[in-house]
C-alpha cells in the first residue's frame, strides 16, 4: 500500500493517517521529519539541506526527492508507505513521477472550508496542561475556563480565523491543483512506465470512526 493523503489543513488527515498506518503496517513519511533526521545524521543530502535551512531558504524539490528516494530504500517501506504533507505542489508531484516513485492510491479527505474554519477557530487551549476544548463541539463547563484548574483558556494564533483563512488560501493556490493532477493521471493510465495511482475522494464530515471506515473502504 503506497499512498498519498490529500486534504486541506484541519481536514483530519493526521488522525486518519494513524489509522491507515496501523491497518497496513506502513510508515508515515513526513518530509519535515525526514529533513530533520538527515540533518541530524549528517548525510550528504542532510548537510546540503542544512545549508538552505540555516539560510532561511526553502529546500529545493530535487533535494527533497533525493531524500524521499533514500527513505524508501529502508526496510520499513517494504510493504508500502504513506506520504503526509507531500507533494505540496505540481512541481513536486512531477519530480516524484520523474524519479519513479510508485503510488497505488491518492486519497482525498474532503471537508468544506466553512467547516474547517469553524473546527479550527473554535479551538481553545489550556496552555499549562495542553488540554484542548472547542466552543461548540467540546465546550468547557464554564465558558473560557479550564475544567480542572479554572484558569483562563486561550486561542492559539494558529487557530485564529484570519490565520486559518490564510492557510486555506495557500492550500487552494498550491496544493488543491494536485487533486486535478492525480485525478487526470488516474484517467490517463500508465505514463513513462509508471502505473497511475487510483484516485479516491471521501467526505471528512462525521465521526472519526465513520471517516475511518470510509477511508478503509476506499482503499480496498
From Swiss-Prot:
Annotated spans, LID: 122-159
Any GO BP: AMP salvage
UniProt main location, coarse: cytoplasm
Protein localization: Cytoplasm
Domain of life: Bacteria
A Pfam family hit: ADK
Binding residues annotated for AMP, in chain numbering: 31, 36, 57-59, 85-88, 92, 156, 167
Gene Ontology, cellular component aspect: cytoplasm
GO molecular function, one term: ATP binding
Residues annotated as binding ATP: 10-15, 123, 132-133, 206
Region (NMP): 30-59
InterPro entries: Adenyl_kin_sub, Adenylat/UMP-CMP_kin, Adenylat_kinase_CS, Adenylate_kinase_lid-dom, P-loop_NTPase
Chemical reaction(s) catalysed: AMP + ATP = 2 ADP
Enzyme Commission number(s): 2.7.4.3
Keywords: ATP-binding, Cytoplasm, Kinase, Nucleotide biosynthesis, Nucleotide-binding, Transferase
Pathway as given in its UniProt record: Purine metabolism; AMP biosynthesis via salvage pathway; AMP from ADP: step 1/1
Function of the molecule: Catalyzes the reversible transfer of the terminal phosphate group between ATP and AMP. Plays an important role in cellular energy homeostasis and in adenine nucleotide metabolism.
Family: Belongs to the adenylate kinase family.
Domain statement: Consists of three domains, a large central CORE domain and two small peripheral domains, NMPbind and LID, which undergo movements during catalysis. The LID domain closes over the site of phosphoryl transfer upon ATP binding. Assembling and dissambling the active center during each catalytic cycle provides an effective means to prevent ATP hydrolysis.
Subunit field text: Monomer.
NCBIfam families in UniProt: adk, PRK00279.1-1, PRK00279.1-2, PRK00279.1-3, PRK14527.1
Protein name: Adenylate kinase
Species annotation: Burkholderia multivorans (strain ATCC 17616 / 249)
Taxonomic lineage from the root: Bacteria, Pseudomonadati, Pseudomonadota, Betaproteobacteria, Burkholderiales
